[in-house]
Amino acid sequence: MAISMKLSWDALACLLLVLSACGSDTSSPASDPPGALVRLQRNSGATTLPGDLTVFSDGGLQLYFDDRGALRKSVAPTDLAGLQAALTDPALSSLAESYPATLPARAGDTLTIYGTHRRSIRYDPSSPDLPPVLQRLIAEVMALRSRF
């Protein structure tokens, strides 16, 4: 009886060890969605085209509405040509973290560019001072967003 009890405890300890090892992977910081090119997160006060849009390299679009769920849609990968051209523009590397520079911490929309040069840029969509490369990128994403 004592031996079977010890074996049971040993088996339970091994199981907990394995589960904790598996669980440590999920507690690491979230990685980028596989195949994601860009994500546009509209601020909570957006009056037109609300929601967060993620664009994937295979033509997949996912539109999230807070806790209400997500809509999915696919476009032909050729429809992403303008966005991919905007993402390869060398001028993107010169963009700052926010536009205008005085934008408050939680204000504005956020554009996240995925890939090897991952970065997030916050901007005021009503600002007339956005750099042309950022305007082009936003226009490409919003054109895809308008398909919903």
Where are these regions (language model features)?
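Sec-dependent bacterial lipoprotein signal peptides
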Residues: M1-S20
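Short, well-ordered, aromatic-rich surface patches in folded extracellular/luminal domains
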Residues: C22-G45, D79, S94-F148
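Post-signal-peptide N-terminal segment of Sec-exported extracytoplasmic proteins
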Residues: R42-R72
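Short amphipathic beta-strand/extended segments with alternating polar/hydrophobic composition
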Residues: P50-S57, R72-P77, H117-S127
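A short-motif feature that recognizes glycine-rich, charge-decorated loops
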Residues: L61-L95
